Amino acid sequence: MTAKFVIPGEMRALVLDGTGFEHLQLRKVSTPRPGPGQMLARVDAAGICTSLIKLVEQGPNHQLVYGWDLERWPLILGDEGAVTLVEVGAELQKTYQPGECYVIQPAVDHAPINHPERYRDGGRGIHKVAVSYTLGGHLAEYILIPEEVLAAGCLLPLPDSKLPYSHAAMSEPISCAVSAQEHHMHLAQSNGLAERSAYKGLKPGGVTVIVGAGVMGRLHIELALSYHPRLVVVADFIEERLDLVKYLFGARAKRLRVGLMTFNPGKADLKAFVNEQSDYRGANDVIIAVGARSAIEDAMGYLGQGGVLNLFGGLKRGDEVVGFDTLAIHYKSINVTGSSGGSPWDIARTLGLMASGEIDPAMHITRIGDLEHAIELLKMVKAQQIDGKAIVYPHRRTGEIKAVQAWTAVDEKNYLSKQG
């Protein structure tokens, strides 16, 4: 039996109609209604992503906004979320049903289909659009799923109905780390006369260094353990973060027989430490999960033969040029890689890892709120006052932001069962 939903004429949404936080507001807008090839979904949970800060501060100048006039066509923000279909367009009713739960990959590799006239130069030459940018986002009570999302294969079903909304909403940021680690390519050769073979991912039995123990760095740690390196070294200047790393991942690392060590580069030399712990062979994989030029440049000093350097933490425009030791790259056959976001496959894999229990999003969630708190939460993220992910429930009203150490399926069920 097809589920029935009552859809209101208006909804609350976080809207950007210019450049800067003074142009960001929560307001009521008309609830979108889907055309024949579109769907409407209820937003069950949404994440507060750091990328929204850049969007707010750049407005129409952001590279994914393509010059839209935001005063005429405001954006609804929110690139992370979990949704339930509530209305399905006539052309899609044999494929989709109201009540089904999904997540949306926000990076949509497709040319604009809707409103090409709003894009710079009529949308010519544009091959990528994005949810939270020119496509409506998750920081609203409902979200329109347009043709672009479906054509690009960016609507992913939840593999397990028991998966909490908040955890499903975390699939996008986690998928970024999944994608990044899959960009690590290593060459193997059993002997000098054997043909080389290539494999992706971190080196099993090797030494992995993760620089930065913030929320994205911690996601990398959790995923890195699944590759079974011999040792994971986590570096950060903030002792509280290093203590948290040991608390969150120490038991799992021990269970997997993976060494887990933390290091404060403000107190001693990271290069010397890594070289000592690797028997002076250097690290096989280094992930830079901070936006710091020095961290990138210093990594050349402790990468080993055939090592991979992943530039996960981006640098600001104007500060993006770094100096590399080209002799180290040349003589040690070092690979330098990077990635920006994930693909639909990365989201699907992430959801599978969640469903199987191989990764646990609960430990990464530290703030809970509703749409009324979205702007405050975003400002807190900008001010680095939140060490973890913030989740918003658009259909749950609560008086204040809730600080948590973790957020489990039971926590979510209890929270959604009551108001206030």
Model-predicted regions and their roles:
Residues 313-332:
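Rossmann-fold NAD(P)-binding glycine/threonine-rich loop
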Residues 204-206, 210-213, 221, 225-295, ...:
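Adenosine-nucleotide cofactor-binding segment
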